[in-house]
């Protein structure tokens, strides 16, 4: 029994080292990109996330069509007793097409070990909610109820306080968008 636990712990440690190394390599690759290349990568990731959201989810697509605007963020979260993460994203007013590039960051303390990569999609019901998010930033204080079920399951969300929020992982849509403790703000370097 003790030997099995040691093997599991060793396997987990190796997996974390490999995952962390690849994450750090991706971060270095990101830093070497020029501003326009970063924008293009963010735009591509946002479109991929929106496409993934709409697959088998007509309610999300309907809310998107009714929305004033949207934002998509790509996040990498590391947890080793402490958790921290961050990422980049873009907010876009649907009618005008105007884009604002943004950042996100999160930190916390809790039980956890691993790396989690996911996208968060915000749909904004009206211009006031969208403009407040973009101009003033936003901090999530609690876990936001997001979508129902496993990959491909139809989301049952609607706008709440002017927003609908979805979290997409490699497993598909998640039952809750765990964005507590996450702050969103304008990326000064990418909006020049």
Model-predicted regions and their roles:
Residues 4, 18, 77-80:
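Exposed boundary/loop context
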Residues 1-10:
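Bacterial N-terminal signal peptides that target proteins for export
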Residues 26-192:
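Small-residue-enriched, tightly packed secondary-structure blocks
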Residues 15-23:
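C-terminal segment of classical bacterial N-terminal signal peptides
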């Amino acid at each position: 029994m003790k030997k099995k636990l040691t093997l599991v712990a060793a396997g987990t440690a190796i997996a974390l080292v490999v995952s962390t190394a690849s994450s750090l390599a991706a971060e270095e690759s990101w830093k070497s990109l020029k501003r326009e290349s970063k924008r293009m990568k963010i735009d591509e990731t946002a479109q991929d996330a929106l496409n993934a959201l709409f697959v088998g989810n007509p309610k999300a697509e309907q809310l998107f069509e009714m929305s004033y605007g949207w934002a998509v963020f790509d996040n990498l979260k590391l947890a080793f007793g402490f958790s921290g993460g961050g990422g980049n994203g873009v907010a876009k007013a649907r009618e005008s097409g105007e884009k604002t590039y943004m950042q996100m960051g999160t930190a916390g303390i809790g039980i956890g070990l691993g790396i989690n990569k996911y996208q968060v999609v915000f749909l904004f019901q009206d211009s006031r909610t969208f403009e407040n998010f973009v101009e003033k930033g936003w901090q999530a204080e609690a876990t936001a109820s997001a979508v129902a079920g496993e990959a491909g399951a139809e989301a049952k969300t609607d706008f709440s306080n002017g927003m609908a929020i979805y979290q997409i992982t490699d497993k598909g849509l998640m039952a809750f968008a765990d964005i507590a403790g996450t702050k969103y703000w304008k990326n000064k370097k990418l909006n020049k």
